[in-house]
Amino acid sequence: PFPDQNIKGGEIEVIGYRGMKEYDIAFEGYEVPSAHLLGQKEGQGFRQLMSTFESARIQTAARALGVSQNACDLALKYSQERVQFGKELINFSRISEKIAAMFAETMIARQLTLYAARIKDTGQRCDMEAGMSKLLAARTAWASADSALQVHGGIGFASETPISRILADSRILSIFEGTAEIQAQVIAKRLFESNNR
């Protein structure tokens, strides 16, 4: 239940990322008491919210890295345990190359995310680097989840396997805290600004 009768909405069922709840919410005739005003001064809330995006995008990149690393680890483990045609899957070059690429891409995304976080820690503007890290890490998470499912074969598509959840969880990462398309716009704008100085 919502704290006021003028707040309406309900829970939205989602296909992945079930560790947090999603809600549809509408404010009908609801007025925010001045004590609850975001930004402590009228007209400042949006600016204050926007200032959180650098940190939020770095955090989302870090979450995406966790998803990607989990996919990598599961693919490696399964490929070492699963035997086909008398040998472990890891001994098939197409599988080992796929897994090697997954780990390499995850490491690249991790380094970019750490770089963005280091810039943020110094207090410098890092919207471009934060956007780059989120864009790359989210794409990497999705690619790693997809590749891990491919390594698992048909069993990976079964809903009771961890890799199916990872695939569903990875998809939202390129959407929240600014879609991949928004990240690309932010990056392009900053590149254009820095190139025209």
Which sequence ranges carry the predicted segments?
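Amphipathic alpha-helical coiled-coil segments
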Residues: 90-98
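Hydrophobic alpha-helical segments of membrane proteins
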Residues: 140-148
